[in-house]
Amino acid sequence: FKNKWTHFFISIPVIIGGSFSAFFITSVNSFMNTPAGFEIKNGRMVNVQPLEAMFNSSFMVRALHVVATACMTMAFILAAIAAFKLLRHNHTEDRTYHTKALNLSMIVGFINTVFSMIAGDLSAKFLHKVQPDKLAAYEWHYDTQSHANLVLFGVLNEKTHEVSGALEIPGLLSFLADNSFDTKVKGLNEFPKNELPPMIVHYFFDLMVSMGIFCFIISGLYMLFLIVKKLRKYVTSNLMLYAILLTGPASMLAIEFGWFLTEMGRQPWIIRGYMRVSEAATQAGGITLVTTLFGLLYLLLLVTSALSLIHISEPTR
């Protein structure tokens, strides 16, 4: 919009709507993992307490993680756009404008990457106490023990439970679980096999963390270059700009991998401890129609968003 106030006021309902959407999605997902606020009597849900269900035990930890990673991703997408513009434009006026945008985006991105890492650490500690089977699946951790290793990537033999080709960091899983290398971390062998999530969740965890670490390193280097005067010339070097260009898709992938992780990590439950996914499958009519309409709606949103972005990017600034 040419008028900055029009742009500002139109953004307000988007911010409010997006925030409420994030709140309710996170609340529902938290409820599915740590259900609360109801009783089961004669196969029926009774004595429902909506607020207790909404603000269940995992809500705050998950909400912090969602907010931090969303802000991080937003910042890195904007930084990637600014970096792309700087790689294309050589005019002094354009470079000044996009450099300011890049500085602000990278600072916000770095701060929220740190918050995301703190939120991730709190999530690991929460899983250790409340969903130890999920944490064990993330790390292919089968035997209960202290000084448990953090396993990165590798290949698991699900019959023998042997892991090959992995990078193992001694004791780090125990430390992440409760700030001590002596912490005992429960292994998968302590849980019923038919209640364990698919072991592929390990890769989603590793990919999510890898993307996050990459964004942290790039934004950390940028902050260093920005603070130290002798290194400031590297802030808009081509190598740095290309690296920043990658933080946009990397941060988006981190969020996607994170959602795959939390949703697949909840399996086989749709409501943990109460209802399996297989029990929740519906045979109601009209599902095909509803699914098709949703698909068409999102296709329309994709096209209109792409056209809007193309239109916005046409002016020089």
Give residue spans per PLM region.
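Membrane-interfacial loop-to-helix junctions in multi-pass inner-membrane proteins
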Residues: 1-16, 93-106, 233-242
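Hydrophobic alpha-helical transmembrane segments
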Residues: 70-80, 207-224, 297-305
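Membrane-proximal extracellular juxtamembrane segment immediately upstream
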Residues: 249-293, 297
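Aromatic-rich transmembrane-lumenal/periplasmic boundary elements in polytopic membrane proteins
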Residues: 23-28, 108-177
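Membrane-interface transmembrane-helix boundary segments in multi-pass integral membrane proteins
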Residues: 61-62, 127-147, 279-299
